[in-house]
């Protein structure tokens, strides 16, 4: 009885912990989405006040999560070390991004990926819808920008920048594809294709359009059965290639090289800026704030010190050697773990996509966009990757083939129930038993048979 009570208490605590985590993610996404719009206030609160309120609510949810999340002492110490490291990197770099990402990973035990995707889908879809409606209604300003290489103005459609519209639309579509993962058909690709058209022709945001095209293609391909076998290996190979290429171009970019120059132009000077900040400032262990770097005027007239739009280069120069090393190791280890467990679900597919997109954006370290980073929590707490997407596990179980079986006589059952018991007694396997112990009058004089799994046999045999 006590074990049953403990089991119920543990399950209830896990569900309560999941609920407060999802609530924290909702407030975090809501704040990020609102900050990308052109709204001056939300429910009477100015944007800085609204941001502070959301941050406090997220922290409060994490404080509650501590009460429900169970782990061993050693795992707790490791989690505490990661949080402390993120705080040190924040103080050194002046960027809180690393703290939020680490907190969501550390408190991500027992969390599932599809509820996170559902929250992201609702938040970003509604944000796009309301911002566009308010823009055409004149409630918010339609800010226009000029791209140096293009003719005409770029509309922001109620956002603070055209690229912000593209990012919100991208994240809404990626969340939708994550929810549909395993069942994505051609009809499901209509909305992503329409979104790509809106990104290109309405706001001229090419990076988000290309990212959504890549994400939709990979999600559609990697949802099929072969992905369970090949997905982890393919993802591991691509991840290593992307990380190595990022650091190679950061260190060895040469504008005189035709390949380098062409790729740099296609990526809007991303290779140049990564190399510029890598060679211009020394690498640090915990990060650097680049306060002494010259201000760069971006397209939206915002002046910033650091312009590096590659996840791995950005992590290295902004948050230091240790954080960059841990990020790369975690990416490799999680796909090795997936290969070992024979698991490839929506969380791992999304993480693989974000690793690829990290070559040209810093989205891969922003948890509001890359909530697939919650997969790293399985490394921290040694939990199976399959629990990130239980619905996929149940679906695979329903589709699993019947395991062939063989039968042998069980003398102990014969001695117990006598020769009057009927035909076969099946223990295990996928078939239902035709009788139960103690029934009489079926095939009198025949020995009961017990079914045992034997994967070496391709047919079913019966001994009576």
Whereabouts are the PLM-identified features?
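A juxtamembrane structural motif centered on a specific transmembrane helix
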Residues: 1-10, 14, 376-464
């Amino acid at each position: 009885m006590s074990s049953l009570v403990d089991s119920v208490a543990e399950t209830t605590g896990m569900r309560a912990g999941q609920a407060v985590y999802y609530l924290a993610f909702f407030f975090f996404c809501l704040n990020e989405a609102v900050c990308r719009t052109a709204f001056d206030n939300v429910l009477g609160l100015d944007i800085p006040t609204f941001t502070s309120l959301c941050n406090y609510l997220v922290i409060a949810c994490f404080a509650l999560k501590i009460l429900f999340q169970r782990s061993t002492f050693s795992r707790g110490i490791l989690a505490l070390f990661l949080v402390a490291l993120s705080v040190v990197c924040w103080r050194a770099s002046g960027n809180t991004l690393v703290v939020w990402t680490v907190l969501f990973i550390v408190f991500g035990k027992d969390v599932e990926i599809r509820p996170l995707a559902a929250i992201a889908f609702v938040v970003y879809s509604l944000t796009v819808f309301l911002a566009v409606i308010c823009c055409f209604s004149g409630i918010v300003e339609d800010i226009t920008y000029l791209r140096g290489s293009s003719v005409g103005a770029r509309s922001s459609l109620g956002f603070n920048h055209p690229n912000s519209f593209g990012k919100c639309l991208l994240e809404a579509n990626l969340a939708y594809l994550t929810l549909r993962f395993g069942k994505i058909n051609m009809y499901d690709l209509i909305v992503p294709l329409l979104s790509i058209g809106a990104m290109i022709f309405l706001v001229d945001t090419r990076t988000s359009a290309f990212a959504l095209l890549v994400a939709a293609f990979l999600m559609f391909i990697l949802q099929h059965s072969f992905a369970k076998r090949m997905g982890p290996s393919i993802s591991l190979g691509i991840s290593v290639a992307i990380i190595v290429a990022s650091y190679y171009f950061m260190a060895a970019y040469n504008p005189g090289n035709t390949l380098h120059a062409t790729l740099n132009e296609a990526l809007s000077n991303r290779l140049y800026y990564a190399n510029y900040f890598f060679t211009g400032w020394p690498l640090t262990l915990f990060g650097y704030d680049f306060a002494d770097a010259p201000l760069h005027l971006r397209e939206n007239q915002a002046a910033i010190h650091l312009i590096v739009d590659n996840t791995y280069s950005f992590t290295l120069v902004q948050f230091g050697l240790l954080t960059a090393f841990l990020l790369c190791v975690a990416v490799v280890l999680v796909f090795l773990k997936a290969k070992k467990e024979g698991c490839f679900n929506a969380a791992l597919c999304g993480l693989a996509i974000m690793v690829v997109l990290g070559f040209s954006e810093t989205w891969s370290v922003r948890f509001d966009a890359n909530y697939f980073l919650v997969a790293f929590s399985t490394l921290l707490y040694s939990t199976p990757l399959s629990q990130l997407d239980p619905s996929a596990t149940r679906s695979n179980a329903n589709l699993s083939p019947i395991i062939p079986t063989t039968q042998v006589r069980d003398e102990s059952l014969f001695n117990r129930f006598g020769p009057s018991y009927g035909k076969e007694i099946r223990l295990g396997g996928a078939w239902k038993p035709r009788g139960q112990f103690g029934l009489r009058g079926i095939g009198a004089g025949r020995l009961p048979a017990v079914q045992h799994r034997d994967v070496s046999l391709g047919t079913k045999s019966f001994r009576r």
